[in-house]
Amino acid sequence: CELLGLDYQDSYDYDYNAGMPSNKIDMSAFEFIKSRTDIFSLLEEAILYAGVENEFKQSGMTYLLPTNTAFNSETSTDLSYFQTHQLTYIDEETGELVSYAPISMTAYPKEQVKEFLLYHIVKGKYTFTNLPAEPTWFETVATADTAKINMYLLKDRNPNIVFNNFDGHYKSSIKPRTSNLYNADGSYMHVMDSWLDRPTKEQLNMK
């Protein structure tokens, strides 16, 4: 079993009686993040910076956990958060405006980081057994009226969850690298190498 290694979606030890992977993690979402600094160091730093540790210790939630790759990958097709949210400064010698990709979420306003993190927490427990086969909007903990996540279960040879696969999202068909981890607080966790962006009111058909 490679659950804690988080290597592959299909590497679980299956419990054929239950019909589900052996997926229990004996710690909270925040403890799990802290235990895996090799892939979650930027996420942990962001959580501490925004002061939302307690939000990652809740029961009955679905946590979508972006890895360091989601934040800092320099591969153009990854469209990482830092690459798509570059900051600027004025070069003192030339007076020109220079863009750069930061190396930490602490470079952004604290409220922006807080809303980003809360958007990746879905209200309710969602996993392979209860997600619909059609794209469906779900409420998140974030406060904006457009802070909804689109999820569904893609039922093919290798079933997987698909996130925010709607027209206009910066990347299509985002899937977790590891899914259905069930933590000690009674919440599900899905580990992702991509971040998720909020839809617009138009995309939600809101007036």
Task: Give, region by region, the residue ranges found by the protein language model.
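Mature, structured domains of secreted/extracytosolic soluble proteins
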Residues: C1-K207
